[in-house]
């Protein structure tokens, strides 16, 4: 099925599009297998932030342009002393900010993977809530081969997903794994033919959109809290506070303060 994705904002190195409640963020550097630069990451952070705040968006897809690569990680040509060097000549690892944003954004994020998801590209796959893989997808880590590593989500959370032994194999040997192998180890949710991947991904989005956004928000926060320590608990606590603010009980406390009177909390139930 051909879809008319609406461009929400123009960027240089990514695409940010919308279709029937779904946002799609596409890394648009196919000439380098969608390797990211500091600018690519900054643009993705901006797009994801906009998707978070847009009440017309319920689910977000992350993908790469073309059929050959989802993302091959950081562009090694931009790697300098102390990080990846952007136009401002400051070395950065701002992809860590992007990883965290994908984790805390209160909407499901689905990785739609075609071709290579290697290095930092595989880590982006790992931090997404769900992964739909095409049958030509290839996954793996290359850090130790190129003098790099991800000691955060790319290793610790990966080990939660595939198991510690398998995660060590992935990092220590730097092998590549096909889509079926990724499915077998729990790295992806399903594998579909390449020409059907967008149809399948949109179908998953549509199913998700039928469900309670508040329930999904808390489920995501709860699952992340298990691995994100106090930062994860802070996110879940913040979500709980936002939900509480919508109740009559919270409004009574606010209104009493504004009206300079004592609040009447006795009117609210004390559930066991």
Swiss-Prot record:
GO terms for biological process: menaquinone biosynthetic process. Hydrogencarbonate binds at residues 141-143. Pathway: Quinol/quinone metabolism; 1,4-dihydroxy-2-naphthoate biosynthesis; 1,4-dihydroxy-2-naphthoate from chorismate: step 6/7; Quinol/quinone metabolism; menaquinone biosynthesis. The keyword Metal-binding does not apply. It holds the Pfam family ECH_1. Coiled coil: none annotated. Disulfide bonds: none annotated. Its EC number is 4.1.3.36. This is 1,4-dihydroxy-2-naphthoyl-CoA synthase.
């Amino acid at each position: 099925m051909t879809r008319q994705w609406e461009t929400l904002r123009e960027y240089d190195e990514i695409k940010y599009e919308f279709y029937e409640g779904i946002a799609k963020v596409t890394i648009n550097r196919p000439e380098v297998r969608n390797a990211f630069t500091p600018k690519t990451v900054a643009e993705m952070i901006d797009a994801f932030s906009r998707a978070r705040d847009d009440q017309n968006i319920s689910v977000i897809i992350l993908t790469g342009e073309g059929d050959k690569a989802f993302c091959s990680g950081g562009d090694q040509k931009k790697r300098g002393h102390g990080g990846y060097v952007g136009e401002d000549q400051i070395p950065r690892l701002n992809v860590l900010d992007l990883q965290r944003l994908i984790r805390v954004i209160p909407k499901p994020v689905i990785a739609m993977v075609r071709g290579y998801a290697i290095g930092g590209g595989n880590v982006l796959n790992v931090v997404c809530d769900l992964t739909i893989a095409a049958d030509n997808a290839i996954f793996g880590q290359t850090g130790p081969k190129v003098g790099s590593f991800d000691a955060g989500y790319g290793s610790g959370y990966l080990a939660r997903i595939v198991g510690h032994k398998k995660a060590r194999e992935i990092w220590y040997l730097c092998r590549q794994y096909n889509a079926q192998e990724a499915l077998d180890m729990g790295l992806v949710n399903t594998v579909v033919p390449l020409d059907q991947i967008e149809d399948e991904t949109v179908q998953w989005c549509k199913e998700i959109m039928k469900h309670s956004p508040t329930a999904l928000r808390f489920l995501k926060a709860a699952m992340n809290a298990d691995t994100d320590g106090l930062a994860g608990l802070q996110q879940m606590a913040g979500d709980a506070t936002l939900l509480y603010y919508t109740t009559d009980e919270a409004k009574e406390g606010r209104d009493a303060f504004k009206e300079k009177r004592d609040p009447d909390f006795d009117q609210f139930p004390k559930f066991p």
